[in-house]
Amino acid sequence: MSSLPFLKMPFLKMHGLGNDFVVLDARAIALDLTLERRRVIADRRLGVGCDQLIVLEQPTDGEADVFMRIFNPDGSEAGACGNATRCVASVVMDERKTDQITVQTISGLLESHKAGMSPNGLPVISVDMGLARMDWREIPVREACDTNHMPVGLGPLQDPVGTNMGNPHATFFVDDLAAIPLAELGPQLEHHRFFPERANIGVVQPLGDRRLRLRVWERGAGLTLACGSGACAAIVAASRRGLVDRRAEVVVDGGTLTMEWLRDGHVLMTGGIAVAFKGELDASLLA
């Protein structure tokens, strides 16, 4: 396999409920994607623009069909992205003409399958996002604590639930989500010293009837229209607090995800995906 900065590189622009991705296929050619190049591609003014840059590589695990790497707009590598996993799974399932595949990430193997079509004709994809981890050392946080009531907060956001879904999440519960200035509080909490690896900051308003309203300040990405791993953390946190019984519709800015925290500890996420457009990256973009 050769390694090139590339002259022209095909890409897919995809999204899951508005959580958007640039998908590059490096299964046949190793891409020279430096930190700065990742940032340029993800920049909505200088490049294509996306919430995360996704790079497909050959799997290193014999049980996987594809290896997916995830990069934030700041160039840092992420351990998990549920909506990106569903997008990638749809692409590879169509390639292989199958209804289920296994996606390898740096956090582990994720099984995904087709779950029908949405009312507007978009593919609906389910992914098992793996085990929800709740020990304070696994999230991680700086000091031993009950992760169902973590001693950290800022202003109206207090007493969060900690969850690791391949990346760290702090989920806060409020009565009025619209009143929370998440663009202001999110980055401060993301970088709070309590979280040695930073954290994704989710804010949930319970709506009743097994429905949760969610917004997430994503680590390394900021506010997005949807956050799959944040929705996973939300269903786990709400279940631990007794607000729902392990299953709920999670309403994000871009739509609705169906979430279930299974009895074996895994979290299942289901929702629609779409291909927005196809294009080519030119080498001049990354000069």
Give the location of each predicted region.
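A glycine-rich beta-to-alpha transition motif near the start of alpha/beta enzyme domains, typified by
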Residues: 1-122, 170-287
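Membrane helix-loop-helix hairpins that form the core translocation module of multi-pass transporters
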Residues: 107, 124-132
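Extended alpha-helical solenoid/rod scaffold regions
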Residues: 126, 139-141, 152
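Active-site-proximal beta-strand elements of phosphoester/diester hydrolases
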Residues: 126-128, 160-163, 213
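Short, charged/polar, Gly/Pro-enriched secondary-structure boundary elements
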Residues: 133-137, 278
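Short, conserved active-site entrance elements at the starts or edges of catalytic domains
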Residues: 140-149, 187, 191-195
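Internal active-site segments that recognize and position negatively charged phosphoryl groups
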Residues: 148-179
